[in-house]
UniProtKB/Swiss-Prot annotation:
One of its GO terms (biological process) is regulation of mitotic spindle organization. Residues 1-37 are annotated as: Disordered. GO terms for cellular component: cytoplasm; mitotic spindle pole; nucleus. It comes from Xenopus tropicalis (Western clawed frog). Keywords: Cell cycle, Cell division, Cytoplasm, Cytoskeleton, Mitosis, Nucleus, Repeat, Transport, WD repeat. This is mRNA export factor.
């Protein structure tokens, strides 16, 4: 019996196998292309939690839709289902049991998509587009956290039309992450707030941004005991900050590094500097991936402060990325991200989602 009630949600045809070949520069890494990708820019990707057998991938797009694929062991992708918003979808997440997907949109709503019944219902409302949505699973409660451009962070019981709690933000929410019992929200004007989620969500600390330019993406990382201990923050200026919440030596432990830059290295030959569009931590090794407007992905070891790999350059930006639950698959999307304005938008250009075998490339290198 299929997990979903609809065996063929959208599109036709099957995906290619691992080790497929590419003929042009839209796929220079020769990674697997996901079948029937969205028809407009892909804003977010999320793999299913380990509670589900197999691997399922969710993508949200500026075509107002959310799509789900089953990813088989051989790399083939099977379209399973699709839901719509009335505005672009900006974020997606899963419930911890894998039965529901939550979607956030420019239509100012968040929805809960029951994958077994393929029904979607509204569960959140803001006064402006909702930029982030996260599932919070605590010992004594579970809820949805939404961050909006209306400068608020709201927590919702999916059975109630009113929020459990509303927290005011200093500015518009640009990106967020949750790893219980910690949440981090980055806002416009370089605002940065850490929340604790035990018992009831509350503000823990406001942090002076380690970055000098607009925040673009954030991801929480864990320590060796599997507890959230800090976060990586990416900006539009081709830079990532690694920030620990309570480091033994803040001046030494917290640092930033440059990435997603090209060409020159000094004032006589200026660099091209690109936005960091996404950050994802490997669930096993704790290493991280960054993707950027330069059309490349890079893998990093933050503890050794080394780069593990940089991809060849795709012919358009990489807009989002995600690891599956055991870190064997790295998904990344190739879409225009509007970083160069409307004059660089080519409506004829296709959007792609690629799958890469990430089992080996994200391993920390052995210290000499």
């Amino acid at each position: 019996m299929s997990l979903f009630s609809t065996p063929g949600g959208f599109g036709t045809g099957g995906g290619s196998m691992f080790g497929s070949t590419a003929t042009d520069n839209h796929n220079p890494m020769k990674d697997i292309e996901v079948t029937s990708p969205p028809d407009d820019s892909i804003s977010c990707l999320s793999f299913s939690p380990p509670t589900l057998p197999g691997n399922f991938l969710i993508a949200g797009s500026w075509a107002n839709d959310v799509r789900c694929w089953e990813v088989q062991d051989n790399g083939q992708t099977i379209p399973k289902a699709q839901q719509m918003h009335t505005g672009p979808v900006l974020d997606v997440c899963w419930s911890d049991d894998g039965s529901k997907v939550f979607t956030a949109s420019c239509d100012k709503t968040a929805k809960m998509w029951d994958l077994n019944s393929n029904q979607s219902i509204q569960i959140a409302q803001h006064d402006a587009p909702i930029k982030t949505v996260h599932w919070v699973k605590a010992p004594n409660y579970s809820c949805i956290m939404t961050g909006s451009w209306d400068k608020s962070l709201k927590f919702w019981d999916t059975r109630s039309p009113n929020p459990l709690l509303t927290l005011q933000l200093p500015e518009r929410c640009y990106c967020a992450d949750v790893v219980y019992p910690m949440a981090v929200v980055a806002t416009a004007e370089r605002g940065l707030i850490v929340y604790q989620l035990e018992n009831q969500p509350s503000e823990f600390r406001r942090i002076d941004s380690p970055l000098k330019h607009q925040h673009r993406c954030v991801a929480i990382f864990k320590d060796k005991q599997n507890k959230p201990t800090g976060f990586a923050l990416g900006s539009i200026e081709g830079r990532v900050a690694i920030h620990y919440i309570n480091p033994p030596n803040p001046a030494k432990d917290n640092f930033t590094f440059k990435c997603h830059r090209s060409n020159g290295t000094n004032t006589t030959a200026p660099q091209d500097i690109y936005a960091v569009n996404g950050i994802a931590f490997h669930p096993v090794h704790g290493t991280l991936a960054t993707v950027g407007s330069d059309g490349r992905f890079s893998f990093w070891d933050k503890d050794a402060r080394t780069k593990l790999k940089t991809s060849e350059q795709l012919d358009q930006p990489i807009s989002a990325c995600s690891f599956n639950h055991n870190g064997n698959i790295f998904a990344y999307s190739s879409s225009y991200d509007w970083s160069k304005g409307h004059e660089f938008y080519n409506p004829q250009k296709k959007n792609y989602i690629f799958l890469r075998n990430a089992a080996e490339e994200l391993k920390p290198r052995n210290k000499k």
